[in-house]
Every structure is written in C-alpha cells, then in structure tokens.
C-alpha cells in the first residue's frame, strides 16, 4: 500500500469519526449530558412558593435551559444555568422536575450531567400541545392563559421543539416528562391525544421511541382528596397507547389544600419517583432517596 493510499484512508476515517460526533442537526454533542423535556400544566410548571431548603445547594451538573428570559435571575432564553428553581418561568415555583434532576445526578456517574427543558402552561388541556390544531384551543383560552401562551411565542409545542433543538446541540434527549390531565379529567381520548403529541415530538426532533421513553405522573391522589383523582385511571391506560410510556404514582405525595396541586414535600417525593422510574430505563440501578 503506497503512501498516497494510506493518507486517503486516514482522511476517509476522519470524516466518519467527525460524523459520529455530530448529532442529526449537524452540531457536536456531549453524550454525557442527558436532556429531558418537561411539559404539562401548573404542577409541571412548579406551583409558586419555594422553601429555603429547595434553593440550594444545587449540584452544578444539574442545569436548566431557560425557555424564556428570567430578568430577575439574569437568565437569557436559550442558555444553560444551574437548576435553581423556578425552572419554567419567573413566576413559577418548585415542581417535580427539580427533584427529578437532583435525584438523577445523585445516582448517576459523576461525569454525567442532567439538563431540563420545561415548557408548561397552567390550566391547559393537552390540546394546547396539538401540533396541528392548537390554535383552535388557544383561541378560546382565558386572558391569563393567553398571556402565558404568548411567552412561548403563541405556540408552546413549537417553542418546546425549538428549545429542544438548542439543547440537542449540547446533549442527548433521553426522555420526556409529562404532568397534565387536570383540565382533561374524564377525557377517555386523552391517551390517544398524548400519543399524537409524543409521536410528533419524536418525529420533529429526529428521535427514536425506543430510546426516549415518556414518563407521565398521576394527579393528586384520591387519598389526598385530589379533585381530579378520577383521571388517574385514564392516565394509567397510557402504556396501552404508547408502549414506551411509564406511569409515576402520586400515592402518598402530599397535596395542597386546593386538592389540585402538590405541596413542596409532595413535589420532592414526586420528582424523586420520576427519577426512580427513569434510572433503570437509562441502564442504572434504581435510586435511593438522597
């Protein structure tokens, strides 16, 4: 084999290696940054009210990609920051994503980072995340909800996709976290509506269902006098529509007096359970509460 042939083969392998280090959008990825998309209603937003113990210290390996500007915290949309709550928008609070991420980094190898992208809208039906028909629902939304929708350029689904694509430049999407259903209580078509949304996300982000599970959390449980607890039966049917869906139990997670939202202690436990569900799916042992 002459020198010219050897040089050509080295160049060819260099191109192959470069391709392996780029994601589908042509950007270098950190395969040790695990990214999780979060969406839903006010419980996934994080209900206002953050207790002192939840403000820190937060491991620097757990970060949030700001989906909107946070002027009061100096966060700029589209950039990564240490995941000190609130994670969704400036007016939101502690939610399940907080202790999901904290529990993950406590149980994953020290070289693994965790990133959250949270686009959620209080009070919304799942129809707001319908890629093709969201405008029909959004046009009937009350003004306070419209104001939230407008922080996402009027299209929360598309905004989530855009933020997720930014996150894909820096990491690999490993899962989708959903907490929604209060506004769809007793809607038997909810699993199919979630399926359509999930499939659209998978397609639009060039993902594979077998590599990106969907974790759906129950609503405030009946044993906490949850106002929408009847919806948990329908939520439990989601794996029949989406084989890669997993249900996170809310039993024992403390609720607030409104019977719709979780208390801070409830969010801590619930977020830990999301993480305990995700860890085996990532190939790691089940988490102990830390």
Regions found by a protein language model. Name each.
Residues 29-290:
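Cell-envelope and extracellular/periplasmic
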């Amino acid at each position: 084999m002459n020198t010219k042939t050897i040089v050509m083969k080295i160049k060819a392998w260099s191109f192959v290696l470069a391709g392996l280090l780029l994601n589908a959008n042509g950007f270098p990825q950190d395969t040790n940054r695990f990214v999780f998309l979060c969406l839903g209603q006010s419980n996934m937003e994080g209900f206002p009210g953050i207790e002192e113990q939840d403000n820190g210290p937060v491991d620097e390996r757990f970060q949030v990609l700001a989906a909107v500007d946070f002027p009061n915290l100096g966060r700029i949309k589209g950039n990564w920051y240490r995941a000190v709550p609130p994670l969704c928008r400036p007016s939101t609070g502690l939610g399940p994503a907080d202790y999901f991420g904290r529990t993950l980094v406590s149980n994953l190898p020290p070289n693994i980072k965790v990133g959250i992208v949270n686009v959620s809208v209080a009070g919304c039906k799942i129809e707001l995340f319908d890629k093709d028909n969201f405008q029909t629902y959004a046009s009937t939304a009350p003004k306070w909800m419209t104001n939230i929708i407008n922080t996402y350029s009027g299209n929360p689904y598309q905004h989530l996709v855009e933020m997720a694509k930014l996150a894909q430049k820096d990491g690999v999407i490993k899962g989708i976290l959903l907490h929604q259903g209060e506004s769809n209580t007793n809607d038997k078509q909810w699993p199919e509506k979630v399926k359509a949304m999930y499939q659209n996300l998978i397609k639009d982000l060039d993902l594979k269902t077998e590599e990106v599970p969907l974790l759906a959390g129950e609503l405030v449980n009946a044993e906490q006098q949850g106002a929408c607890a009847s919806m948990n039966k329908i939520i439990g049917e989601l794996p029949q529509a989406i084989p890669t869906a997993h249900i996170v139990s809310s039993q024992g997670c403390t609720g607030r007096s409104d019977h719709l939202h979780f208390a801070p202690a409830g969010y801590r436990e619930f977020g830990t359970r999301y993480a305990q569900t995700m860890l085996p799916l990532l190939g790691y042992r089940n988490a102990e509460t830390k």
